[in-house]
Amino acid sequence: MSYLRPSLVMLILLTLITGIAYPLLTTGLSQLLFSGAANGSLLYQGDKVVGSALIGQNFTKPEYFWGRPSATADSAYNAMASAGSNLAATNPALDKAIAERAAQLRQANPAMKGPIPVDLLTASGSGLDPQISLAAAQYQLARVAAARQLAPEQITKLIDESTDQATPNFMGESVVNVLKLNLALDALK
């Protein structure tokens, strides 16, 4: 019985600290210091939320840049089903999926004769990547420029503005946020 009171006091104290004080402190600090990120890095078109800079979206029209293939099975970029494809490099299903994606990309981008950037052929670990490499954006440049009847130089400028530079440079490659780029293209209308 002598242990009951200190145990209850400790339970109440730790519940207040870890269940109320700590969450309120971290939420308050994140809202104060990083409000955009704390609220999901939402992107707007006018007053309407159109997505998050952290989650890819499925673009298939020729006038838009396409992101990485999604590994989510039921529907593309379904965050509830986020997972990698888990196909081994020797799996025939992976070879078939890559061949189908390559054929689709070659058909959609007939002006491009070189190799297709790997991030346009393979799904990411999460299946939800919002970015593509600069090479993947440049691979699609001619198709998007023709579909929108814009000068390639004008779109190249938008690609540069939508590029997140690797910091520091040796920590990876620069990437292009596909949703930001497509929103910038829509803003040109």
UniProtKB/Swiss-Prot annotation:
Single GO MF descriptor: ATP binding
Entry GO CC: plasma membrane
Domain of life: Bacteria
Main subcellular location: membrane
InterPro entries: KdpC
Quaternary context: The system is composed of three essential subunits: KdpA, KdpB and KdpC.
Job description of the protein: Part of the high-affinity ATP-driven potassium transport (or Kdp) system, which catalyzes the hydrolysis of ATP coupled with the electrogenic transport of potassium into the cytoplasm. This subunit acts as a catalytic chaperone that increases the ATP-binding affinity of the ATP-hydrolyzing subunit KdpB by the formation of a transient KdpB/KdpC/ATP ternary complex.
Protein name in the entry: Potassium-transporting ATPase KdpC subunit
Organism: Serratia proteamaculans (strain 568)
Phylogenetic placement of the source organism: Bacteria, Pseudomonadati, Pseudomonadota, Gammaproteobacteria, Enterobacterales
